[in-house]
Regions:
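Short helix/strand-bridging catalytic loops that position acidic/His residues to coordinate divalent metals
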Residues: 2-9, 138-144
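Immediate flanking context of iron-sulfur cluster ligation sites
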Residues: 5-16, 167-177
Length: 243
């Protein structure tokens, strides 16, 4: 019998939205959610300002999709490709990762001073968070209250940045390019929406970005290198280890 663990219906499993079931299903009954077309629609909507953030791991993995040596860092080519696809601004999730580090450090200092809610647990992985919620609900006081870099970026983009460029939050579309499918689930959580407007509107995987680049007829390996946009494209080296 082919079924989830414990023969439970899929909707009743303690799913952490990692996406591995798609790869492991022996009969090919599952498929990932494809978010390329919502991105294309946003890019072709003249009423929307569309910005994109890319996770650190994407700049390495994207090169392999186009035949570059494994481990090749393709940051500049990736930024160029994203601009050619039509994104108004290309930003780096590392900017928000630096903020996450500062927020978590501040929170740890306060907890140590008050000697409460220790130890502090931290992870930007939504699968890990969901696993904790499923398996260890009695420990939910331990994780840091800081958002993941993806969600912190979205919150900043829909507030500070939207105000800075004079665009209403509902007309600013934030797209994330992430190495993990669970980031799609994270962006959909209720606590990351305000007045019906999501902090991060659409999440695509590295492979989906590669598909979009091919669909646009872009020769990735031949691209010149460009830099991220300012101010949300600036970061320190410490942020890169978030992945």
């Amino acid at each position: 019998v082919v079924a989830p663990a414990g023969l439970k219906p899929l909707a009743e499993t303690e799913c952490v939205f990692c996406g591995q079931c798609v790869q492991a299903c022996p009969v090919g009954a599952l498929s990932e959610i494809d978010n390329k077309y919502p991105v294309w629609r946003a890019l072709n909507d003249p009423s929307k300002t569309v910005v994109v953030q890319t996770a650190p791991a994407v700049r390495v993995a994207i090169g392999e999709c186009f035949g570059l040596e494994p481990g090749s860092i393709s940051t500049g080519k990736m930024v160029t490709a994203l601009r050619m696809l039509g994104f108004d601004k290309v930003f780096d999730t590392d900017f928000a990762a630096d903020l996450t580090i500062m927020e978590e450090t501040t929170e740890l200092i306060e907890r140590v001073k008050k000697n409460e809610k220790l130890p502090i647990l931290t992870s930007c992985c939504p699968g890990w968070v969901k696993f904790l919620e499923h398996q260890f609900p009695e420990l939910l006081y331990m994780p840091s209250s800081a958002k993941s870099p993806q969600q912190m970026f979205g919150a900043i983009a829909k507030s500070y940045y939207a105000q800075k460029i004079g665009v209403a939050p509902e007309n600013l579309v934030v797209v994330s390019v992430m190495p993990c499918l669970s980031k799609k689930y994270e962006a959909s959580r209720e606590e990351f929406s305000h007045d019906g407007v999501r902090d991060v509107d659409i999440v695509i995987s590295t492979r989906e970005l590669a598909d979009m680049i091919r669909e646009a007829g872009i020769r990735f390996e031949q691209l010149e290198e460009q830099e991220y946009d300012s101010p949300l494209g600036e970061s320190t080296g410490a942020a890169v280890i978030f992945g």
